[in-house]
Structure formats: structure tokens, C-alpha cells
Amino acid sequence: MGALPAGFRGARYALGNATLMPGLIDVHTHLTWYFNAQDRFHTNSDGETPGQGAIAASANAYATLMSGITTTQSLGSPEDRDLRDAINRGALPGPRLLTSLGSLSEASGTPDELRAKVRAFKARGADVIKLFASKSIRDGGGQTMTDAQLQAACDEGHTLGLRVLVHAHAAEAMKAAVNAGCDQIEHGIFATDEVLQLMVQKGTYLSPQCGLVFRNYLDNRAKYQGIGNYNDVGFKSMEESMPLGIATVRKVTHTKGLKVVFGTDAVAGAHGRNVEDLICRINEAGQPPLEALHGATTLAAQSLRLADSLGTLAPRMLADLVAVPGDVTRDATALRRVFFVMKGGR
């Protein structure tokens, strides 16, 4: 939104009684996750072709953009790279995309082997590194990576100029990741006051989920059931975790000084409904609307190291704009009714 050249004739938009906001930023999605032709969660062994996967990912990206998400971080699969590059060169409509291209875990090797794999991700074009330091919530969420593994991976990422994000549910996994200097914790459902204060001291970002991801899994249970740990035990765990997730978001968003950003973990079935998690933060977890929106714009841009171009409406910033009817600070559900999206001035 810098100075216009002399003689420039631009369009005028009459948005009426609307809230105009910076484009929303979702720091945790999975754009390549989709339901296949059999209406089941896609896996690499279901017979779907790469072309089918590309079409599905493109549709997910478009749905995400039209919901008001103009930038997202897909964490992550190798297919994200082609999707990112196609969007960035204007071949496909979609949100500005960053990706980890995959993830590393306790099974990825010794500290030295982890360093080598971080370098390999960088060489392949990863924008960020993702680590799994704990089990899935469907398996209890306990710590898996050792302190030495976390230290090596986070240190190598920083040496290469990459941010390092860590999937961690258990407080001990969160603490280990924070002490290792990692940049952001994903989920954090079992966060304690002690680890949250440590995050405040270290300036670590937190991306918790309020309800969309669990509700989406439960609503689409038949499409996931029987694949990997999407079993009866796993679904029971997710059902039991729903109120805990909301309580955790309530606790973390009321922890003074904690950098809480907007990340939905949107998977197959949730793309285009990302704002439901933001509405949950406001209406169910009690986060003040402006603080919730700050976490989905300015603060999220800072977490991506893109605050010099995204996240605020100001001169010389990229023109990412979203409009919803009425006053979103009085009615958070207005976020469901996005009627205007501009990304990069288009």
C-alpha cells in the first residue's frame, strides 16, 4: 500500500457497513490433506493419482483464501512445495504459503543425523522446520524427542536462518523445546503455568487450537476411522480433549505477555472453515475480540518474520484485506461471512 504512480487509475470498492481487516494468517494448516474419491481420508496407499492430489490441494487452497486467510503455513508435506510455488507465481489462487515440506521426530536419528536432515530440508526449499517432540493427542501426547535431539535440530535450523516449530502436547515436551531455543510450540494442550511463564521469558510463540480440529475429526469420523491411530481409542481421546482444548486456550490467552498466535491445524474437512477456531477463542474461551484478531494478523506476521510486509493496514505494507459485514468485535460469527478478499492488491 505504497505511493501510486502518477496517472494511476484504480478501482474503488464500496464495502458499506463492514469491518475491514488485514488478511488473516493461519500459522498451522495441512493443505494437502483431503478426502479421496471414496470419501475417505487420503493416504499414499489408496490408489489416488498425483493429479487427483494436486486438484484437491488446489481446492483446499482456494477455500482457505476465500475464508479470509491470505497467508498460511502448511506443516507439511513434500507436495506443499509445488502448491506454494504455483500460488506464488500466480498460476493458482490461494493464500501466500510457507511450508516445512515434512517433519522430523525421535525416529529421525541422532543429533548429528537430525542436523543433516534439517540441512536437507533447507536444500529442498523448506521455509520452516517442524519437529514432533510428543506423541499425538490420540496416543496420549507424551514427550518423544530427547533434549539433545531438540537442541540439535533447533540449533541447526537457526544456523540456516530457519524458524523451528515444535508439535508438543505434554508440558515436559514443551519445556524441552523452549529450553532448546525453538521458536514456536504447536498445540500445548497440557501446558502448565510453569512452562507458560518460561515461554513468556524466552519469547516463544504458542499456537493452540480451540476446537475446530477436534470437532472436524469427530464430524468426519467415518472418513478417518481405521486409518492409523484414528481408531476408537483415538477418537475417545479427541472427544475428551475438546473441553480441555478450550480451557487451555482460555488459560494461555489470559497469560500476560505470552505470544499466542492463530493456528488451526486444519486438516481434511476443515479447509475453508479456519475462522471457526477464531470464533471459538472469542465466544467459548473468552479471548477479547481485538486480541484474537491481533493474534491472527500482526502477531502472526511477526511469528513468520513477515511483519515488515504483512499483518497491518499501513503504507508500504502488502495490500491483504478482508471485509466482513457489521462489527466483528461485537459479533465474532461475522467472520463466517467474509464477502471481500484482497491478497497483494488483487
Put a short name on every predicted segment.
Residues 18-89, 148, 172, 177-180:
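Metal-associated gating/positioning segment near the N- to mid-region
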Residues 17, 25-28, 68, 97, ...:
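Divalent metal-coordination and catalytic microenvironments
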Residues 159, 230-233, 241-328:
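His/Asp/Glu-enriched, well-ordered alpha-helical/loop segment
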